[in-house]
């Protein structure tokens, strides 16, 4: 049997609509996130420039280019969010 002094009540849930809990990212967090997405986009772009000797290479190249541009745009969005 547990002693009554060790009994703990669960805390009340936090009201996320409360203005005290508005979440903002700090500048270093935004810079790291933007750098990571932009770097990933640049890497994907550089990999899309490598010639492919496979069937449907144009489709694969455009798919990788689309991902690269998406990552770069996400990085820019993350920076100015």
From Swiss-Prot:
The keyword Mitochondrion applies. It holds the Pfam family DUF4536. It is found in: Mitochondrion. GO terms for cellular component: mitochondrion. The keyword Mitochondrion applies. Keywords: Mitochondrion. Induction: Differentially expressed during meiosis. To yeast YDL157C. This is Uncharacterized protein tam6, mitochondrial. It comes from Schizosaccharomyces pombe (strain 972 / ATCC 24843). The lineage of its organism: Eukaryota, Fungi, Dikarya, Ascomycota, Taphrinomycotina. The gene is tam6.
């Amino acid at each position: 049997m547990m002693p009554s002094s060790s009994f703990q009540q669960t805390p009340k849930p936090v009201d996320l609509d409360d203005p005290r809990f508005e979440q903002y990212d700090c500048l270093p967090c935004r810079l790291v996130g933007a750098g990571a997405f932009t770097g990933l986009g640049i890497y994907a772009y550089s990999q899309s420039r490598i010639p492919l000797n496979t069937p449907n290479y144009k489709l694969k190249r455009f798919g990788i280019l689309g991902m690269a541009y998406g990552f770069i745009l996400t990085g820019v969005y993350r920076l100015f969010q």
